Amino acid sequence: MLLSKNSQLILRHRKKFKTKKVFFSGNIQDDFPLSLSTMRTKINFHKYNDCIDFKKKIMNNNIVHNNLLISQEMIQNCDVIIYYWPKDKSEAKFQLMNIISCSPINTEIFIVGNNSSGVKSAPLMLKKWIELEKIDSAKHSILISGLIKKKAIFVLEDFFKTHLWKNLIIKSLPGVFGHKKIDSGSKLLASTFSNRITGKVLDIGCGTGFLSASLLYFSPDAILTLVDNNMYALKCSQYTLNSNKFNGKIVYSNLYSNVFKKFDLIISNPPFHNDLQINFNIIEKMICGAKKYLTKTGELRFVTSRFINCHFLLNKFFQKYYVIKETSQYKVYQAFYK
């Protein structure tokens, strides 16, 4: 089993956990929680595909959770928390404040992360509630720990950011693409929605719900289905739709994994990063699988960075496609079923 650098660092301290009831959360990227010897293990994932993949590897599905927020019930009877720091500090604070608000006093917490992700800011960020100390470091990762001395007050609504675009209200949580500002690529794609769009529309990787809200702004009769594998994104999309009095079906899905209908239009601003690394897998899978979910007059319309060459895949899977809009940074592609 290949372990991430963060998990390798925790492994060096495995003796600490043999008699402990351990709760794993955060940016877990491997199967290490299954191999660490503990008295009891619980795990919470925020991404649909991570949870499903993990459940396939174990007999006892009760230890694996897929919840937006940690609850006291979920974390009860655990005396140690192992938290994997994500790439975004605001997401880490959001998740850790939630955890600290639910955890009993004197619960021990271990935080591990890559130096480049901002994990070194954790002691200052959390000093009101935990006195954290560095206990180990290796291969550009750091492990810090401490005891929870005071419970945090956590209110979900306090972490939402609100963005405005063309009188639309866009709601965003930490860890969701477009949290700090509406992405320029998404705005470029949204600018192509000005002509009236009808029929069924699938929004892949819906994030904050910006694309769906923009489309419904111009085409209120369109029937939207929004999918994402991130629980935070789905919550944001629901808040965005509600804030603008729009309707849409919110579905937990890793690309097409939970999609069973055909659509007249598929829209997306697909990610090309996996954590801190560039990764084109999602773009490739989206293009390769699109025709299965399009009607015979259907269309795939997406935006991506102009340095990403999509021509080979579009030529392979679609009879005709066009670049319908572009800037110095982005291109919007339009591909037709036939």
From Swiss-Prot:
EC number in record: 2.1.1.172
Superkingdom of the source species: Bacteria
Catalysed conversion reaction: guanosine(1207) in 16S rRNA + S-adenosyl-L-methionine = N(2)-methylguanosine(1207) in 16S rRNA + S-adenosyl-L-homocysteine + H(+)
Principal localisation: cytoplasm
The protein's enzyme class: transferase
Keywords of this entry: Cytoplasm, Methyltransferase, rRNA processing, S-adenosyl-L-methionine, Transferase
The keyword Thylakoid is assigned to this record: no
Pfam families in alphabetical order: MTS (PF05175), MTS_N (PF08468)
Listed GO CC annotations: cytoplasm
One annotated GO molecular function: nucleic acid binding
Cellular localisation: Cytoplasm
Subunit structure: Monomer.
Cross-referenced NCBIfam families: PRK09489.1
Family: Belongs to the methyltransferase superfamily. RsmC family.
Biological function: Specifically methylates the guanine in position 1207 of 16S rRNA in the 30S particle.
Name the record gives this protein: Ribosomal RNA small subunit methyltransferase C
Gene this chain is encoded by: rsmC
